[in-house]
């Protein structure tokens, strides 16, 4: 008799965005003429930059000729892409990385979910609350989180770090020792950021406690303000304790193309039951060479084109487009009387629901009355209750139309 990994039974009944899709589809069946505008799930709408398309076309043509055909590539990524990543994303900020410290992958979602495999099941993990669900769900699958408390909306063995309105949506250090710390800045879902000084507090904590920070920096390209670090490695000592995840998905429109990378410095040590240290970099390389065959050559060629002079201009134009959407949403909601966070250094706007209205209640009200779909804050954790996320990844026309509807119908 085949038996399941019973940790899967501890997961919520459905993934957050699957539940949203179910409700939207149900509403559309009942209201077939409704013009639904989706400002919920964080998929992009702008096409790939022309320079990326041309690079991928050329790479595909190379694959069609015997003399330039490539089979399996290096699991860690082609040197031509890793060199550009280091030279453009890190060196200008004073961060020195080795070629063997960057791992090209098919997405930050898979990397943030998979990286926990290296950690022992008894490690204590900490997450911000609200939080991107993948961090929690992947650890539930591994058996690291304990059982789910329905009343609290939390797992018994996770240390939750509340991000509250009173605390400006920024987490405080855990009061008990933890081993794994998930941080995402610019944050999904709140859109907030940390200063270098605030980030240093976390790095210092991790160094003192031999903890490891799993730092999701997928939205760093959207940072507009000076003084906001784009990489955790801008903080002294971070190379000893932090893994950084980045993605081309939102930066360059690769959500349907799939390319990202993870930085694992060779300075980071992880310990066995005897206290002996082991290289986290070597363990992640071992994991990747066992379970991953690398990102396709045409996709990596497209990602490398992002770093050309023309590529940088085209990508920046797309980022500017989305951040103008963010401004429209943020200012429109403020004009309508909503309290909002984010939308300045991130494509996410985190709004407080009216009065005592719950997140899912507001979701239904917004969909039925304004025909606009967002993401209920409760789907990101117990502390997301009473909040709602909108994203700036829609078209300009739909973004403007959605905000006008909200201002007119949701007062």
From Swiss-Prot:
Its EC number is 2.6.1.83. It is an enzyme of class 2 (transferase). Its cofactor is pyridoxal 5'-phosphate. It catalyses: (2S,6S)-2,6-diaminopimelate + 2-oxoglutarate = (S)-2,3,4,5-tetrahydrodipicolinate + L-glutamate + H2O + H(+). Keywords: Aminotransferase, Pyridoxal phosphate, Transferase. GO terms for biological process: lysine biosynthetic process via diaminopimelate, diaminopimelate-aminotransferase pathway. The keyword Transferase applies. It comes from the Bacteria. Pathway: Amino-acid biosynthesis; L-lysine biosynthesis via DAP pathway; LL-2,6-diaminopimelate from (S)-tetrahydrodipicolinate (aminotransferase route): step 1/1. Pfam families: Aminotran_1_2. One of its GO terms (molecular function) is L,L-diaminopimelate aminotransferase activity. Pyridoxal 5'-phosphate binds at residues 72, 108-109, 132, 188, 219, 247-249, 258, 293. Substrate binds at residues 15, 42, 109, 132, 188, 293, 389. The modification N6-(pyridoxal phosphate)lysine is found at residue 250. Involved in the synthesis of meso-diaminopimelate (m-DAP or DL-DAP), required for both lysine and peptidoglycan biosynthesis. Catalyzes the direct conversion of tetrahydrodipicolinate to LL-diaminopimelate. Belongs to the class-I pyridoxal-phosphate-dependent aminotransferase family. LL-diaminopimelate aminotransferase subfamily. Homodimer. This is LL-diaminopimelate aminotransferase. It comes from Desulfitobacterium hafniense (strain Y51). The gene is dapL.
